[in-house]
């Protein structure tokens, strides 16, 4: 029963996502392209944050002389 409830909840979130982004009006292939682009941009943002954030944090800490 828990799997069914979780599936209903995920379906509800996906339906809300379609409504908020107006993707329900698109063809399935257009929706796939949009979702692929969205996931690609999000993945690049996470990767960029992972790679460059430590450098920026260390520069800030050196600037405020927290770390020598």
Swiss-Prot record:
Keywords: Endoplasmic reticulum, Lipid metabolism, Membrane, Sphingolipid metabolism, Transmembrane, Transmembrane helix. Component of the serine palmitoyltransferase (SPT) complex, which is composed of SPTLC1, SPTLC2 or SPTLC3 and SPTSSA or SPTSSB. The heterodimer consisting of SPTLC1 and SPTLC2/SPTLC3 forms the catalytic core of the enzyme, while SPTSSA or SPTSSB subunits determine substrate specificity. SPT also interacts with ORMDL proteins, especially ORMDL3, which negatively regulate SPT activity in the presence of ceramides. Its main location: endoplasmic reticulum. It is found in: Endoplasmic reticulum membrane. The lineage of its organism: Eukaryota, Metazoa, Chordata, Craniata, Vertebrata. The chain crosses the membrane at residues 10-26, 32-54. Residues 27-31 are lumenal. Pathway: Lipid metabolism; sphingolipid metabolism. Component of the serine palmitoyltransferase multisubunit enzyme (SPT) that catalyzes the initial and rate-limiting step in sphingolipid biosynthesis by condensing L-serine and activated acyl-CoA (most commonly palmitoyl-CoA) to form long-chain bases. The SPT complex is composed of SPTLC1, SPTLC2 or SPTLC3 and SPTSSA or SPTSSB. Within this complex, the heterodimer consisting of SPTLC1 and SPTLC2/SPTLC3 forms the catalytic core. Within the SPT complex, SPTSSA stimulates the catalytic activity and plays a role in substrate specificity, which depends upon the overall complex composition. Residues 1-9, 55-68 are cytoplasmic. This is Serine palmitoyltransferase small subunit A. It comes from Danio rerio (Zebrafish). InterPro entries: Ser_palmitoyltrfase_ssu-like (IPR024512), SPT_small_subunit (IPR051900). The record marks 25 as: Within the serine palmitoyltransferase (SPT) complex, defines the length of the acyl chain-binding pocket, determining the acyl-CoA substrate preference. The keyword Transmembrane applies. It is a multi-pass membrane protein. It holds the Pfam family SPT_ssu-like. GO terms for cellular component: endoplasmic reticulum membrane; serine palmitoyltransferase complex. Disulfide bonds: none annotated. One of its GO terms (biological process) is ceramide biosynthetic process. Belongs to the SPTSS family. SPTSSA subfamily.
